[in-house]
Amino acid sequence: MKQAILFTLILFFGTTISLFAQNPIQDILLDSNLRVRAVQLGDQKIELNPSTPLISYSVGEEQFSSSFPSSKLTFSIEKVNRLDGELEWILSFTNTSADTIQLHNVYPFSAEKTEVLITGKGKHSLSRTHLFLPSRSPVNVIVPDNAWELGYAAISIAAKDKVAALTRRDRESIQNGTRRRFETVLFPGGKVNYHLYALSYSGDWQAGLTRVFQEKMLFDLSEFDNSLFDREDLKWIRHSYVMHLMYAWDKFYYDLEKGEYTLQDFLERGKKLYGGDEVISIWPTWPTLGLDQRNQFDLFKDLPGGLEAMKNQASLSREKGTRFFVCYNPWDEGTNSKNHFEGLYDLLLATDADGVVLDTKAEAGREFQDAADRVKPGVVMYSEGMAIPKAMPTIVSGRVHNALYYPPMLNLNKLIKPEFAIFRVAELFKEKIRREFATAFFNGYGTELNIMAPGQPDWVEEQYAFLGKTSRILRENTFNFTARGFTPLLPTRVDSLWVNEWKGEEKTLYTIYSIRPQGFKGLLYEVEPNEETHFVDLWHHKLLSPMEKDGKWWIEAQTEAFPEYELGTNNEGAVDCIAQLPIVLKASLDGDFLNIQTSRSKGQIRVWAGAPNYAKDALELEAKVQQVSISEHFGRFEGDLVIQYLEDGILVDETIVNLKPGTPRTACPACVPLVQPCC
């Protein structure tokens, strides 16, 4: 194979100091077979033994590499000078055969040499991207919509030095070929370029992934304008976890027979099932838009009671803690010559809405936010699709579209920008959807229930109760799920159970997802205990004690069994959630009395008879040392009493005491008068 290799090195040192700062890779040295023989890291040249191919790729069903190339392709390599000092090469592939070929699964190095690998697997039309770890089942992952074909790999080059590398296809470079989601079809003589980026890191494989996905944002943009994310008035959406999207003619919004609005009843119902909706979105346009000469703004005006009635519903919803969204259809040309941004401004002004669903959009553009800002602060743009990294500066929220049914388990968009508010779109009418709620919970984001399609099956309340359980944990620990302490896929002692870590300022959460139908209970992952913290299972509400094994500390996890026939359906799976919390509370039982001690007084204490649940109320107390009568507040309840300390609705600590069935309810000695003998 003919190869033209151009090595031109100009070092360029930027002035920005990264939080992930590492020595940049100055060069990757190749042998004559395009194998990596050494890495120049600062002033140190590290030899690789054995060497590894620079890249691997597939043509059709066959796998090749730079060391063992396809006879149908040639490629050249050109060094790019980057302002950030990181290493970038352009790999140019040319189809030199007389056949039409499909080039795909282009990734750095070789699968055998990597600590972690991301590339395609299978033939799914929308979702093939998988993350591979040694001796583990591959994990299907979600990546940005402009990067489904990406390849990622990490290798160790020395005791503490590692290389993370990324390949990205240059869509605009395709000549005499066709771009598909995962493949590039090259006709004879066709060409396509891939960019290969490489940077150094140390630590576990997740550190390299975080550098590439979060620090470099997949090299989609060189600088990120964070101004929208810094705005206090827009931060509320990142702490929101349940929304419903419905038609304006839905029975839950308006009763045609009675001629009255029913939305507030729907919102009240939701409070008992899943803690209520942070957002409700009303859709009066598609699919009726286009049936007559009215444009989208006319359709809003023609609703019962007009825009004033919608404004009233928005106000009533906010009283219940729910923001009110309207929709916008950019494809509506209509018959009204009014500028769309002015039309949107007028609609927001008339309805006092709190946000806009941007139909068919995956980004916003500042014109949309500017139009909203003229009305009032805090109006959020919410796109139908998920913004790619270079579009994220224009919008603060988006969704995992329901076009991707049975979505991948791990969403790497969450790693890219943890502050970006993500909602998974789920539909109730098709089948039970516990997996939708479970995977959203595992990834630390919310759920949009799209109930446009008619149907409220008899199992809806059961599913909503599961959503309530996941959403409570998300809400009460929201700052962990929006902080930059996300580490995906911690090492576990067993396969088919996955653990994500979410570090915050004073506590750490672990979300766990299982597809083991037989259930699981046992030591699962490694932890670092200390005297100031303890471990609590927030899903099962029980205290946990780490166990030492092989010189390491391990924590026990537990997941429920589920029918094996549900594997592969949207109702598969089980979850757990474990927290390492600061020790603030101490509790004990003394007959009929619960003794509570707290080292903090700023917040609130809640006592639950059994597990916390939105369908019941907790006993709410001041944060102080106190004694509580169990029978007075909970009657004859026997079982676990869950005691929580919260500050501004955020869980700080939890402890549990068990009142064993049949325990005598003796009063405290100080409260019982002395009994004199009768004779």
Regions found by a protein language model. Name each.
Residues 28-263, 267-279, 455, 459, ...:
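Carbohydrate-recognition beta-sandwich/jelly-roll modules
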Residues 87-95, 507-515, 594-596:
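Short, well-ordered beta-strand segments enriched in hydrophobic/aromatic residues
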Residues 91, 562-571, 607, 636-657:
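Short, aromatic- and glycine-rich surface loops/edge beta-strands on solvent-exposed regions
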Residues 189-199, 376-524, 529:
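Active-site-proximal substrate-binding groove within the catalytic cores of carbohydrate-active enzymes
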Residues 254-365:
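Aromatic-lined carbohydrate-binding/catalytic grooves of carbohydrate-active enzymes
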Residues 306-309, 316-321, 332-432:
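Active-site neighborhood of glycoside hydrolase catalytic domains
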Residues 549-585, 634-637:
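C-terminal beta-strand-rich structural cap/linker in extracellular carbohydrate-active enzymes
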Residues 572-585, 617-619, 648-674:
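Edge beta-strands of extracellular beta-sandwich domains
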